């Protein structure tokens, strides 16, 4: 009976003992890994930027623009670069789009595989470590210019203070991970401008609505100075995407919600004198 059930399955699936799906692929068929697949189609490819994240009282938010570029051309205007990876985490990628999509899908399966094998979900630190390993596995393609950098957010269920349980983890191209203590971070070509904006706008004690507005405004500022970043497109009604993580789980904002926030940001900025930001003391 056992032979009949196992008929057709490669021996690797029956003898491999690991909770890591990435390690299983390395053993079974390394060509299925993102770096190997990308090598087959190496050449000029679309790149995506910019991703921003910020904590608030009780959670953390992730937002991303919708533009992808290929050289000096706009390759896409409505690309979603954010993914909910499980109930309490999400990831956004900047860099080569094809590799980013493969790495994100692999990370989602990695988390699901671990939970099925071990019977419990990975800790937040464990999730970021697994993502770091996936990024490190793409090092050969990164050296060839096909870089993909993630920005990871999550809610720490083991945090002593639920109001400060939101976490942001960034990575470099070789897989090193850094937990952001400042409460905000940005990656991609527009990140210097987005971070400068968040440095003034971010308030870790604010609610999710105020933080979402700050993130959309940061993307607006990035798009103002970085041609590879797409801000709110008021003509085509294309707006940034955003994900919220709290103790209740992950939530993806609807197009209607994001449109309302973007409209308010653009209206507020349009009311200012051109080229000058006005700040009012509270």
Swiss-Prot record:
The active site is at 49 (nucleophile). Its EC number is 3.4.25.1. It holds the Pfam family Proteasome. Coiled coil: none annotated. It is an enzyme of class 3 (hydrolase). Its main location: cytoplasm. GO terms for cellular component: cytoplasm; proteasome core complex, beta-subunit complex. PROSITE patterns: PROTEASOME_BETA_2 (PS51476). It catalyses: Cleavage of peptide bonds with very broad specificity. It is found in: Cytoplasm. Keywords: Autocatalytic cleavage, Cytoplasm, Hydrolase, Protease, Proteasome, Threonine protease, Zymogen. Residues 1-48 form a propeptide. Pathway: Protein degradation; proteasomal Pup-dependent pathway. The keyword Cytoplasm applies. InterPro entries: Ntn_hydrolases_N, Proteasome_sua/b, Proteasome_suB-type, PSB_actinobac. The formation of the proteasomal ATPase ARC-20S proteasome complex, likely via the docking of the C-termini of ARC into the intersubunit pockets in the alpha-rings, may trigger opening of the gate for substrate entry. Interconversion between the open-gate and close-gate conformations leads to a dynamic regulation of the 20S proteasome proteolysis activity. One of its GO terms (biological process) is proteasomal protein catabolic process. GO terms for molecular function: threonine-type endopeptidase activity. The keyword Hydrolase applies. Component of the proteasome core, a large protease complex with broad specificity involved in protein degradation. The 20S proteasome core is composed of 14 alpha and 14 beta subunits that assemble into four stacked heptameric rings, resulting in a barrel-shaped structure. The two inner rings, each composed of seven catalytic beta subunits, are sandwiched by two outer rings, each composed of seven alpha subunits. The catalytic chamber with the active sites is on the inside of the barrel. Has a gated structure, the ends of the cylinder being occluded by the N-termini of the alpha-subunits. Is capped by the proteasome-associated ATPase, ARC. Belongs to the peptidase T1B family. This is Proteasome subunit beta 1. It comes from Salinispora tropica (strain ATCC BAA-916 / DSM 44818 / JCM 13857 / NBRC 105044 / CNB-440).
């Amino acid at each position: 009976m056992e032979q009949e059930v196992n008929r057709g399955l490669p021996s690797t699936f029956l003898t491999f003992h690991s909770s890591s799906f990435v390690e299983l692929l390395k053993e079974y068929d390394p060509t299925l890994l993102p770096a190997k697949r990308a090598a087959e189609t190496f050449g000029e490819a679309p790149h995506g930027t910019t991703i921003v994240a910020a904590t608030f009282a009780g959670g953390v938010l992730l937002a991303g623009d919708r533009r992808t570029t290929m050289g000096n051309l706009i390759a896409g205007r409505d690309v979603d670069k954010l993914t909910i990876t499980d109930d309490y985490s999400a990831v956004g990628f900047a860099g080569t789009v094809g590799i980013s999509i493969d790495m994100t899908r692999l990370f989602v399966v990695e988390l699901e595989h671990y939970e099925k094998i071990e019977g419990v979900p990975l800790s937040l630190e464990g999730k970021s470590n697994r993502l770091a390993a996936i990024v490190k596995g793409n090092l050969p393609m990164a050296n060839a210019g096909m870089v993909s950098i993630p920005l990871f957010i999550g809610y720490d269920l083991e945090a002593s203070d639920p109001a400060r349980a939101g976490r942001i983890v960034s990575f470099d191209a070789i897989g090193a991970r850094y937990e952001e203590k400042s409460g905000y971070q940005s990656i991609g070509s527009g990140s210097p401008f987005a971070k400068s904006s968040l440095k003034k706008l971010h308030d870790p004690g604010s609610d999710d609505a105020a933080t979402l507005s700050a993130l959309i405004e940061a993307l607006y500022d990035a798009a103002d100075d970085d041609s590879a970043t797409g801000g709110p497109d008021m003509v085509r009604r294309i707006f940034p995407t955003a994900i919220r993580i709290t103790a209740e789980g992950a939530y993806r904002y609807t197009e209607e919600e994001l449109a309302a926030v973007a409209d308010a940001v653009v209206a507020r900025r349009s009311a200012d004198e051109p080229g000058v930001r006005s700040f009012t003391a509270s």
